[in-house]
């Protein structure tokens, strides 16, 4: 037997989970995704979401309502007569009519160990906070923001230099395995639910643009966590004076560095390997990217953009 299923998701993160459920033989009667968005320099082209594109490759019908305020959209959802809806990074809070619009309800794949990091940016926030462990949880959705009871948990270790991009990929794959297992148990009538604890609630708010500018006045551990938590998107950055022109440089990866001289101004370049003094300690910039350029390792970057020891990056003075 297989479940009659609706899948709801939008970004690349959700695609492996859609694929896994399809390969598991479930009858996916509809895929819901965010509407196509303007793309290109002039915004004249409309780009379908990664889930939308993959669903079409699989031959699945796709619906892209802006929201579910219209009764017609709610009726269309109910008309699928689905057993269950699987929701993974769809991008909308679902109204009661959708949460109760299938026989068994809506199950969500969320990229954190709830109740820590409820909300929009759990992967980035976990790394930026210096967490050493996170995970993927399958929960039954209710009206709250990631507050529903948990059905299944898979844990992942966050290594010291792991970026948000690397963690994203790991959780996406583990999430696919977890969701297939959860749906098999649900189909068998053996998927117990456990209420989330009331203590330990932390919200993963969206990343603000102001957070992406590196503040070297922070301790090196926090600078390092910010860099890897914002990599590859939206990217942590600083400004440097290159041949008399202030240029924005994105840092895609870094490492903690050992320093003996702790009296340097934060933001000071300490050597020819792009070791940068911080408020406490130092970080080494490993991979960088200029605006409009390609990502480069530090040595290759310095060959085209010489930055000497003693340079003080402008972002250290920004107070952000």
Swiss-Prot record:
Attaches a formyl group to the free amino group of methionyl-tRNA(fMet). The formyl group appears to play a dual role in the initiator identity of N-formylmethionyl-tRNA by promoting its recognition by IF2 and preventing the misappropriation of this tRNA by the elongation apparatus. CDD domains: FMT_core_Met-tRNA-FMT_N, Met_tRNA_FMT_C. The gene is fmt. One of its GO terms (molecular function) is methionyl-tRNA formyltransferase activity. It is an enzyme of class 2 (transferase). Belongs to the Fmt family. (6S)-5,6,7,8-tetrahydrofolate binds at residues 112-115. It comes from the Bacteria. SUPFAM superfamilies: FMT C-terminal domain-like, Formyltransferase. Coiled coil: none annotated. Its EC number is 2.1.2.9. One of its GO terms (cellular component) is cytosol. InterPro entries: Fmt (IPR005794), Formyl_trans_C (IPR005793), Formyl_transf_N (IPR002376), Formyl_transf_N_sf (IPR036477), Formyl_transferase-like_C_sf (IPR011034), GART_AS (IPR001555), Met-tRNA-FMT_C (IPR044135), Met-tRNA-FMT_N (IPR041711). Keywords: Protein biosynthesis, Transferase. The keyword Nucleotide-binding does not apply. This is Methionyl-tRNA formyltransferase. It catalyses: L-methionyl-tRNA(fMet) + (6R)-10-formyltetrahydrofolate = N-formyl-L-methionyl-tRNA(fMet) + (6S)-5,6,7,8-tetrahydrofolate + H(+).
């Amino acid at each position: 037997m297989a479940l009659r299923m609706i899948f709801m998701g939008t970004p690349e993160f959700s695609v492996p989970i859609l694929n896994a459920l399809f390969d598991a033989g479930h009858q996916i009667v509809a895929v819901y995704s965010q509407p196509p968005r303007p793309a290109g320099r002039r915004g004249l082209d409309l780009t379908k979401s990664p889930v939308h594109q993959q669903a079409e490759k699989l031959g699945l019908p796709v619906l892209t309502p802006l929201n579910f305020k219209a009764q017609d959209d709610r009726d269309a959802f109910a008309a699928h007569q689905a057993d269950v809806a699987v929701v993974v990074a769809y991008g909308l809070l679902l109204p009661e009519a959708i949460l109760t619009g299938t026989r068994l309800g809506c199950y969500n794949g969320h990229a954190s160990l709830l109740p820590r990091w409820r909300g929009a940016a759990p992967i980035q926030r976990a790394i930026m906070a210096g967490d050493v462990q996170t995970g993927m949880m399958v929960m039954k959705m209710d009206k709250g923001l990631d507050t529903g009871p948990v059905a299944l948990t898979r844990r992942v270790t966050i290594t010291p230099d792991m970026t948000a991009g690397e963690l994203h990929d790991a959780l996406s794959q583990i999430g696919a395995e977890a969701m297939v297992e959860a749906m098999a148990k649900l189909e068998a009538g053996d998927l117990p639910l456990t209420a989330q604890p009331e203590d330990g609630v932390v919200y993963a708010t969206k990343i603000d643009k102001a957070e992406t500018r590196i503040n070297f006045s922070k301790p090196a551990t926090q600078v390092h966590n910010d860099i890897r938590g914002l990599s590859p998107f939206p990217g942590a950055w600083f400004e440097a004076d290159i041949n008399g022109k202030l240029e924005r440089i994105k840092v895609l990866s870094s490492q903690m560095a050992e320093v003996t001289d702790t009296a340097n101004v934060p933001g000071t370049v300490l050597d020819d390997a792009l070791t940068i003094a911080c408020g406490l300690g130092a970080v080494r910039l490993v991979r960088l990217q200029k605006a409009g350029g390609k990502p480069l390792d530090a040595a290759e970057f310095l060959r085209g953009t010489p930055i000497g020891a003693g340079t003080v990056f402008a972002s250290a003075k920004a107070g952000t």
